[in-house]
């Protein structure tokens, strides 16, 4: 899973209902550790919010994109979508959302930088924020974002630092990942 902090929230569901927005993305305050993650920007041409992943940023704009004072929020990968709005958008797009393709350069063996170079193609569901007029973001506590992207992250989540509550939520209390490097 990409975010073990994601879970249903009555408070967020009520907020989403009250806004009437077709799409809502949960965002959290970026720290220096989050500089390379996706963040929300406003499209100058359309005024819509869009998700911008670092691999989509032009090299000349990388420094500004990583500036956490200029772009203070990052995408937690938790979204809320009105079913009727999604149904209408899918009908408009012949059943396929036109999400941008993200191109990531990687190596076949991530532990060996000299292994064969490959290109990973992916889309991010959070990028759908740019498809709906009136999309919004809601700032959430850091505890709603517990990413597991590497074996190091999984090691931390499976350690005794975190525990599963009676309501099946991962809990730690401080929600700041220690730096762990496995051999």
Question: Which residues make up each language-model segment?
Answer:
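Acidic donor-binding/catalytic loop of UDP-sugar-dependent glycosyltransferases
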Residues: 4-14
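Divalent-metal (Mg2+/Mn2+/Ca2+)-assisted nucleotide/phosphate chemistry catalytic cores
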Residues: 1
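Left-handed beta-helix
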Residues: 14-183
């Amino acid at each position: 899973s990409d975010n073990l902090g994601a879970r249903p929230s009555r408070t967020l569901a009520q907020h989403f209902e009250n806004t009437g927005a077709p799409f809502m993305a949960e965002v959290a305050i970026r720290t220096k550790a989050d500089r390379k993650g996706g963040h929300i920007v406003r499209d100058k041409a359309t005024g819509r919010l869009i998700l911008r992943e670092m691999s989509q940023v032009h090299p000349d704009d990388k420094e500004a994109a990583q500036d956490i004072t200029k772009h203070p929020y990052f995408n937690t990968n938790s979204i809320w979508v009105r079913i009727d709005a999604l149904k209408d958008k899918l009908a408009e797009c012949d059943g396929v959302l036109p999400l941008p393709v993200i191109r990531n350069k990687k190596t076949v063996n991530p532990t060996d930088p000299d292994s064969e170079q490959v290109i990973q193609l992916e889309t991010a569901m959070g990028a759908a924020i740019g498809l709906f007029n009136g999309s919004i973001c809601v700032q959430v506590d850091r505890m709603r974002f517990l990413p597991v992207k590497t074996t190091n992250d999984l090691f931390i989540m499976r350690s005794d630092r975190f525990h599963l509550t009676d309501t099946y939520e991962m809990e730690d209390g401080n929600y700041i990942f220690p730096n762990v490097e496995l051999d």
